[in-house]
């Protein structure tokens, strides 16, 4: 039930399909609240949290699926199975940045974001090569991509002007309940005036505290 899965449920409905529901393995949706409201609730599409597909049925083509609830270890719970007669199953399995060009250039990748490891100017491990947007890490909104591209352009300008130094380096690490943090490197002798961090939490937290 990430944003793409939610949006596709609405799109299928608008195109005339009868959507039986959206299943999410986790006990919460990974999509934006507005997409849950506008894509599912407004169209009466059920959201099955803590559920996964355990069986598919059909001869020559898909005819049905079985959903089951999962426990805290994400294992199906016997006796919770639900069967649906369907002819289409869409799988929304997340996004991974396309980085074949970065690999070809020998850029160091961050295993947490599946994209390049960058500093506060969005420069990669190869001097003069910068990364931003969904080629760096997956963004929820295009507005964030545009803003990050602006910061990367400013960093590129600093590099071309020769005011960027890379002598002193520290690494930013994701702590408890944080999946990743970008940028992953800070060159402390050449920081921009403002350093913005992007991160994703591992699960929804209400009333949480951010510690740097």
Task: Give the positions of each predicted feature.
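Residues forming the flavin
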Residues: 1-212
């Amino acid at each position: 039930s990430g944003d793409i899965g939610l949006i596709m449920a609405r799109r299928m409905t608008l195109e005339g399909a009868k959507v039986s529901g959206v299943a999410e393995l986790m006990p919460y949706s990974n999509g934006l609240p507005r997409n849950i409201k506008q894509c599912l609730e407004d169209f009466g599409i059920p959201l099955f949290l803590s559920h996964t597909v355990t069986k598919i049925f059909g001869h020559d083509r898909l005819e049905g699926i079985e959903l089951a609830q999962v426990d805290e270890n994400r294992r199906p719970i016997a006796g919770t199975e639900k069967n649906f007669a369907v002819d289409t199953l869409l799988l929304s399995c997340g996004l991974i940045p396309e980085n074949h060009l970065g690999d070809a250039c020998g850029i160091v990748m961050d295993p947490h974001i599946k994209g390049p490891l960058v500093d506060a100017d969005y420069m990669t491990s190869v001097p003069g090569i910068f990364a931003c947007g969904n080629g760096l890490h997956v963004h929820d909104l295009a507005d964030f991509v545009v803003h990050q591209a602006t910061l990367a352009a400013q960093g590129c300008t600093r590099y071309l002007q020769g005011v960027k130094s890379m002598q002193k380096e520290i690494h930013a690490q994701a702590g408890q309940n944080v999946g990743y943090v970008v940028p992953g490197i800070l060159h402390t002798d050449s920081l921009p005036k403002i350093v913005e961090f992007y991160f994703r939490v591992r699960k929804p937290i209400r009333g949480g505290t951010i510690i740097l």
